[in-house]
From Swiss-Prot:
The record marks S151, R158, K160, T161, Y254 as: Part of the allosteric site. It comes from Histophilus somni (strain 2336) (Haemophilus somnus). Homohexamer. Belongs to the glucosamine/galactosamine-6-phosphate isomerase family. NagB subfamily. Its EC number is 3.5.99.6. This is Glucosamine-6-phosphate deaminase. GO terms for biological process: carbohydrate metabolic process; glucosamine catabolic process; N-acetylglucosamine catabolic process; N-acetylneuraminate catabolic process. It catalyses: alpha-D-glucosamine 6-phosphate + H2O = beta-D-fructose 6-phosphate + NH4(+). The gene is nagB. Disulfide bonds: none annotated. The keyword Signal does not apply. Pfam families: Glucosamine_iso. Allosterically activated by N-acetylglucosamine 6-phosphate (GlcNAc6P).
Length: 268
């Protein structure tokens, strides 16, 4: 496990974007051997997408041979709805880079057969071998994608009922009206995430501090989905200072010293 303790959320976004670009460029993808990137939605990664667009515009990276898989999508929300994750991804990222449309994969929450859609998604991921890097965010209760507390750590892509806490948290995108938030979503499973070669979680803000503490110092258990990343062979938590406030001082000190070079790659 790596923990990258930075000062601000802006530094988190820059570090994450640079890391993604470095991984893509080192991989040197081709049409026959694309780089497979897992992506989230939500407020936390939004600035990272802006940083990635800047790096693309500066010709530091191309997404032509990058294949993407998104984490989740609401059930029953039309793709063209402004709060669908299809709309989010195209408006905030895909429309601004050179990714090929056929390389974009997002779950279809409007299909008549949700189980078949989830099975198809898993098979599509397997057809590429693996996801090379999965970027994600985390909820205040430690959920990743829509793997809410008590989700099976062996779960695969499936339909999930959203918790009341998630409905309330997401209502800010629906005129603060909980009744407008879809009650169900299709989401990758915890095991789907753990299958990725690398997982990078962005954790910012004091409201995420308990989740980060559970992920780094807590025991592995299904009530804190984030804790499953302790089982991953290459998990990276990129966090700002407020998010580290529930960690032990010696934990932060240890990773700060260990990751000096990585930290200064953003600060310099």
């Amino acid at each position: 496990m790596r923990l990258i303790p930075l000062k601000t959320a802006q530094q988190v976004s820059k570090w994450a974007a640079k890391y993604i670009v470095d991984r893509i460029n080192t991989f040197a993808p081709t049409a026959e051997r694309p780089f497979v990137l897992g992506l989230p939605t939500g407020g936390t990664p939004l600035q990272t997408y802006k940083e990635l667009i800047k790096l693309y515009q500066a010709e530091e990276v191309s997404f032509k041979y990058v294949v993407t898989f998104n984490m989740d999508e609401y059930v029953g929300l039309p793709k063209e709805h402004p709060e669908s994750y299809h709309s989010f991804m195209y408006n905030n990222f895909f429309n601004h880079i050179d990714i090929q449309p056929q390389n974009i994969n997002i779950l279809d929450g409007n299909t008549d057969d949700h189980d078949e859609e989830c099975r198809r998604y898993e098979e599509k991921i397997k057809s590429y071998g693996k996801i090379n890097l999965f970027m994600g965010g985390v909820g205040v209760d430690g959920h990743i994608a829509f793997n809410e507390p008590a989700s099976s750590l062996a779960s695969r892509t499936r339909i999930k009922t959203l918790t009341e806490d998630t409905l309330i948290a997401n209502s800010r995108f629906f005129d603060n009206d909980v009744t407008k938030v879809p009650k169900y979503a299709l989401t990758i499973g915890v095991a789907t995430l753990l299958d990725a070669e690398e997982v990078m979680l962005l954790v910012t803000g004091h409201n995420k501090a308990l989740a980060l503490q559970a992920g780094v110092e807590g025991n592995v258990n299904h009530f804190w989905t984030i804790s499953a990343l302790q089982l991953h062979r290459h998990a990276i938590f990129v966090c700002d200072e407020p998010a580290t406030q529930e960690l032990k001082v010696k934990t932060v000190k240890y990773f700060t010293e260990l990751e000096q070079r990585a930290i200064h790659s953003v600060l310099d």
